[in-house]
Amino acid sequence: CNNPYARVRTPAIDQLARNGIRFTDAHSAGALSGPSRYGLVTGRYFFRTPKKSEYWGYLSPYIEPERLTIGSLMRNAGYTTACVGKWHLGLDWQLKDDSKPQILTPKKFGYTNTDFSAPVKRGPTELGFDYSFILPASLDMPPYAFVRNDRVVDPDVILTADAYPKKQDETVYAWDRKHTNENDIYWERGVWWRNGEMSRSFKFEEC
């Protein structure tokens, strides 16, 4: 029902559209994915939060613990809720040594003081979602690890540079030639991400 000329059949999506509400006019709450996601999850404009930047993998939580979310709203209405995919709204990571900061080097791209074996707090399951399977940030910044509910799936952490050597000779540069930072990891043709912590079993490869 969404596209009569489509070559691929989508009966499940079509049924959802017929039995629910189709949103055909959408507007973004921000120019980046994080602010847009914050607006979708909370129903609030991102500029109403005290945070204005700090967009990287280990950012602190954006959503206040008492904030109503689409997850808690739907759960209160009797639905079972889940959050799957990119989160990048901040998590409360536990530290190995509370006397030290989380980031141990000024470049942010080496090992950190993060305890990946400890429960991860202030995530989706504390914000109205019964189940979650998320990537904490985005695919171009550490930590590269999956989090199921409040636990890192594979807490055995290494650096991306240990798994994928730095290779610039086969790299296809972007239009602005931004893929030249010394902390970047290059692998095969055009694949690029920042050096940092990753689960040993995490695979950053095309299937």
PLM region spans:
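Formylglycine-dependent sulfatase
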Residues: 1-207
